[in-house]
Amino acid sequence: MVKVGIIGGSGLEDPNILLDPVTVAVDTPYGKPSDDVVEGTINGVECVLLARHGRKHDIMPGNVNFRANLWALYSRGVDVIIASTACGSLQENVEPGHLLFPDSVFDRTTGRQSTFFDGSYDQAPGVCHIQAHPTYNEKLRQVLISTAERCQLVHHRTGFGVCIEGPRFSTKAESMVFKSWGASLVNMTMMPECILAKELGIPYATTALVTDYDCWKEEDHVTASSVMKVFAANVEKAKTLFVEAVGEIGKIDWSAEILKLKTEARESVMISPDVVIPFLTTDNQKKF
């Protein structure tokens, strides 16, 4: 049976979406994750929930230990990961309250630890030149999209986000430039989470919860308070989406997909093929 990792952004760290939740403290070779994980089931499917910013939301985007977060989920045996993330809209038709399922991202962050293969852990040797396209797992993305359609949630099937360092919002000049690039979203946490999942060979997809129009739109300047008002309503939509999507994910055999991703990740590491990287081995591959 598949085990699903859920990375909850602001407001979506509620353990009550799980049946029989159990809190588990986790340490990793890359330090402590943002918080303890919470394990339980949704629709009979095992799940592991992690609050990206901590359950008190006291970790700013640039200080999130993304490597520890992803490793914590890997160490608890998750097979796929779905995530949520609050975003500002850069396009008129992507309205606050809508959901969007990104298919790519433009990285504007600075200084974040974006790879497991930096020499700090002996079981992650070499240098990993992971392919960043496709950024998100298409099979998992399609599960989220079809679930949103079935739940009649207003959503957009494609679009890319610009991930900024934060914690400040964009200047108007930045917002206008991002908009001119054709980006749909601006956000602070889309990177490097998706890339780290690829390095682990774990299917990963995110759901963008649109909260505002950033500052490119004269009459709708973004503020923290305005974001949270819309986000509260979006959280309920995301909970509905994730509860239903987990049930669908549990019906799918992910063996071939995971084998493909782990093989691609291992082939991306510049080191002798004779060197064993434990978390990318495909021997004794889990059967669903």
UniProtKB/Swiss-Prot annotation:
GO molecular function: S-methyl-5-thioadenosine phosphorylase activity
Known EC number: 2.4.2.28
Segments crossing the lipid bilayer: none
Signal peptide: none
Gene Ontology biological-process annotations: L-methionine salvage from methylthioadenosine; purine ribonucleoside salvage
GO cellular component, one term: cytosol
Record field: catalytic activity: S-methyl-5'-thioadenosine + phosphate = 5-(methylsulfanyl)-alpha-D-ribose 1-phosphate + adenine
Name assigned to this protein: S-methyl-5'-thioadenosine phosphorylase
Organism lineage string: Eukaryota, Metazoa, Ecdysozoa, Nematoda, Chromadorea
